[in-house]
A protein has these predicted regions:
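Alpha-helical transmembrane segments in inner-membrane proteins
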Residues: 1-187
Length: 187
């Protein structure tokens, strides 16, 4: 195929394979990657502001590791995409809760203690991920590795996700002034 057929496909005049590849495969995947990247960026910046630490992110705090372990277990159980995503969300929330509980200790928690607890938990989750990959049947390992690297092969038009990103950004912009004050710390 040449560029002329791609342009015709973009104009909606072509119902060939080129059109199907662009509008049914490539465009939904690109849109999904854009939305997921936007959501991850928003989550990261909000974590950094709320915890008043530029090192805070889902990986350092162990949230991503908890999501990965839960998702890999869901893949092992043969769950489909929605179940895997749901398991990852539950794993992320459970890991975040565990970080907050463990970092509190006997008194109040500090951001330093929270980050150090997250680093320890992230290392533990990394070991669990390695163990799951090592003992998993060969038939599942490829799918697990692709999922861990950010697989978007099974995607569908993400209008709901795009709407969620837009609403989340609008809410964050609504709190922008307060978040800026919070990021300055104590004056």
């Amino acid at each position: 195929s040449d560029w002329a057929s791609v342009v015709e496909g973009l104009r909606g005049r072509d119902l060939s394979v080129d059109y199907a590849v662009v509008f049914q495969l490539r465009l939904p995947r690109a849109a999904t990657a854009f939305v997921v990247g936007g959501m991850l960026g928003l989550a990261g910046v909000l974590m950094q502001i709320l915890l008043r630490n530029p090192l805070a992110d889902p990986y350092v705090l162990g949230v991503s590791g908890g999501a990965a372990v839960a998702a890999l277990l869901a893949i092992l159980l043969g769950w489909h995409v929605a179940g895997i995503s749901g398991a990852a969300a539950v794993g992320a929330l459970a890991s975040m809760f565990l970080v907050f509980v463990l970092s509190r200790g006997s008194g109040d928690w500090s951001t330093t203690r929270l980050l150090l607890t997250g680093v320890v938990l992230a290392s533990g989750w990394g070991a669990v991920v390695s163990f799951i990959l090592a003992v998993s049947p060969d038939a599942h390992v490829r799918g697990m590795l692709f999922w861990l690297m950010g697989d978007i092969s099974e995607t569908f038009p993400g209008w709901i996700r795009l709407g969620l990103l837009i609403v989340s950004l609008l809410v964050a912009f609504g709190f922008a002034r307060s978040l800026n004050l919070l990021s300055l710390g104590e004056l």
